[in-house]
Amino acid sequence: KREKNMQSISIITNPTTENLVGRSHWWGAPDLPEDVPYPYVMVDDTQVVMGSTGMPKRDIHGNVIIEHGEDYPEPLTFICQIRMEDVAPFDKEGLLPRKGMLYFFAAIDYFLGDSSPIEIPLHGPVGDMVRVIYVEDVPDDVQPYDLHWEDTGESIFRPAEEITFYEGVESSETHALLSIPYQDEVSDSYPRHIALLQVEEDDRWGLHFFDCGSLYLLIRPEDLKARRFDNLQCEVFTY
C-alpha cells in the first residue's frame, strides 16, 4: 500500500462551451487517434421467447423456447480523458505517465438511469466492462470521435465538461485520481491497490450508485508504473 499522507488528485468538473479537443474533459467525445478503435463489448442477442400472458413460451416437451439472434457490438460509456501534462504537477510519486492522454471507458449506463445490456461488475476484475486506453503521442490534428445512435441519429455522448485539478487528500470524497477509498470496507478489501479513478455520484448527471455510493477503478501501483491498465479491479460501493 502507498505511503500515508500522499495526496490524491481531486477532479472538479464544470459545464462549458469552450472547445475541449486535446484537453482534459469529463463526458463529451474522446479525442481518439484514428488508429485507436473505440472500445465495444460484444453482446449475445439470445432471448427467451415470451408468450401473451407474459410467461416464457415452451415447446411440446416443456422446454423454454430460446430465440438466437446475432451478436452485436455495444459501446462502452466514455467517462473522461486526462491529459497527462495537466496532472503531472500533482503526481508527486510519479505514478502516471508524464505525457500523452489517458482515456476511461466503462459500462455504467445503468447507473446513469439508462437501459443497457452490459454493466460493470460490482466487485472484482473488470473483464471487458472497463477499458483504460493510454496514448503516449496524441496527434495535433486529433478530432472528437463521432458515434450516433442508429434509431435517432443523436450523438451517444453527453455534453463535455471542463476539468480542474487540484491537490486532494489521500482519501477524497470527490472525483479523483490516485486516491485511497475513504470507505474502510473498500480499502481493506484491496490493501495493495489505489484508485486510478474514483467517481462520485452527481445529481446533475443522474449518476447514482444505488442509494448512495462510489465507483472505484483500482490498480496496484506497480501495475500502474508498468502501464498495465488492463489489470484493474472494480468496486461499486454502496451504503
Language model region names:
Residues K1-N5:
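Short, Lys/Arg-enriched N-terminal segments with co-localized hydrophobic residues
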Residues M6-Y239:
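Preference for intrinsically disordered or flexible, low-complexity segments
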